[in-house]
């Protein structure tokens, strides 16, 4: 394979690198060298970017959970090849490892995967391919959540969970499935 996979860069990083490169190309004298530290800042911003801890597909059948340096893949069906190809660059060269779940639950770092309502709700975020209830105050990414909001990415930092959904990123466009009326 003659391809090197790298994690995607944040928009700010690309803009800073482009600004430094433009500065470097426009000027001819020594002030143009000021573009080099600006480009270095853009590269530093790219290196500081953190990939999501959880990715959930738009149908909640495919879930990837990052725990430390390992990315676990949780699925109850055959994984969708297209989705896996789209997710591959998110973590760079880190391979996806199938999660070994017992009794329909997995605790992978601060994330709890549950195929049925869990008895223990002590996690930063609860992820499930089924509809779940019963864990008050805990962010739940389940089948109903992704039905309403689309594919979801989650970043976990301590007890704080940041969610980013496909519907929030895409907005109301002709090609986006309309928000379901329940």
Where are these regions (language model features)?
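Membrane-interface segments at or immediately adjacent to transmembrane helices
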Residues: 48-113
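Glycine-centered flexibility motif
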Residues: 19-21, 42, 109, 150, ...
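Transmembrane helix-bundle segments that form internal channels/tunnels in multi-pass membrane proteins
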Residues: 1-68
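Solvent-exposed soluble domains appended to multi-pass membrane proteins
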Residues: 119-182
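Short, flexible beta-strand-to-coil junctions
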Residues: 58, 77, 117, 129-132
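Helix N-terminus capping/helix-initiation residues
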Residues: 10-11, 80, 142
């Amino acid at each position: 394979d003659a391809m090197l996979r790298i994690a995607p860069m944040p928009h700010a990083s690309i803009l800073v690198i482009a600004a430094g490169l433009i500065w470097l190309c426009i000027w001819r004298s020594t002030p143009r060298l000021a573009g080099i530290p600006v480009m270095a800042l853009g590269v530093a911003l790219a290196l500081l970017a953190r990939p999501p801890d959880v990715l959930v597909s738009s149908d909640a059948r495919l879930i990837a959970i990052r725990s430390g340096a390992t990315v676990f893949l949780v699925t109850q069906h055959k994984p969708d090849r297209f989705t896996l190809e789209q997710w591959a660059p998110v973590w760079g060269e880190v391979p996806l490892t199938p999660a070994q779940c017992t009794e329909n639950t997995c605790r992978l770092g601060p994330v709890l995967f549950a195929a049925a309502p869990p008895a223990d709700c002590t996690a930063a975020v609860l992820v499930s391919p089924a509809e779940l209830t019963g864990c008050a105050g805990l962010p739940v990414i389940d089948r109903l959540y992704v039905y309403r909001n689309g594919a979801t990415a989650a970043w976990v930092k301590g007890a704080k969970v940041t969610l980013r959904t496909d519907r929030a990123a895409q907005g109301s466009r002709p090609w986006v499935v309309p928000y379901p009326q329940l």
